[in-house]
Amino acid sequence: MDASAVRDQFGIAQDALVIGMVGRVNAWKGQGDFLEAVTPILKAKPKAVAFLAGSAFEGEEWRVDELEKAISDSPVAGQIKRIDYYSKTTELYNLFDIFVLPSTNPDPLPTVVLESMACGKPVVGYRHGGVCEMVKEGKNGLLATPNQPAELSKAIQELADNTEKREQFGKASVKRQKELFSLQSYIRNFSELYKK
């Protein structure tokens, strides 16, 4: 899918490197760690953009206010975009060059990772929860020690600096998602079990 129209919609240059995350704004989705991790990268790459998408639960809108304040106080605020929940998530994944899952607690089934993989994105996340099954480290993504934003930043940086590696990882993500996590693979595996 061509992301140029989506980039135009959000005012992002066609040649900008976009590092993105999609997640509910809550105590453990890791928006704070994400901002901490991308800040040095954005400082070093003035054309790069960090993109956050997600809303808070009803009654917890104050979390969004806190996040907005953290963004506006950031030394790279001009390179950070944040939107509320966006129904056309495929458009967002196609907008991103790197997908990040910075959840500070283990997420047993982060479907956002599978969705980004299906869109051919390399994944960076913390080494806990379901992402460890989805990402084959060094093949379609990189994992960092949980709750270590500096290490997360290093992993993002590695992909930010290497277009070829991003493309290789992206292709591997599509292949891995189809082979192991698609509906077709589920049906195939279920059929094999049933035959036994």
Describe each PLM feature range.
Residues 137-138, 142-149, 158-164:
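Conserved acidic donor-binding segment of nucleotide-sugar-dependent glycosyltransferases
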Residues 64-84:
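Nucleotide-activated donor-binding/catalytic signature segment of Leloir-type glycosyltransferases, i.e.
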Residues 8, 151, 158, 165-179, ...:
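A short, well-ordered alpha-helix in the C-terminal region of glycosyltransferases
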Residues 122-125, 135:
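Short hydrophobic beta-strand element within catalytic cores of glycosyltransferases
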Residues 17, 21-40, 150:
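A conserved mid-protein helix/loop that constitutes part of the nucleotide-sugar donor-binding site
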Residues 94-108, 121:
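Acidic donor-binding loop of glycosyltransferase active sites
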Residues 1-12, 67-69, 189:
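A short helix/loop element that forms part of the nucleotide-sugar donor recognition site in Leloir-type
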Residues 85-86, 92-96:
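Short alpha-helical donor nucleotide-sugar binding micro-motif in glycosyltransferases
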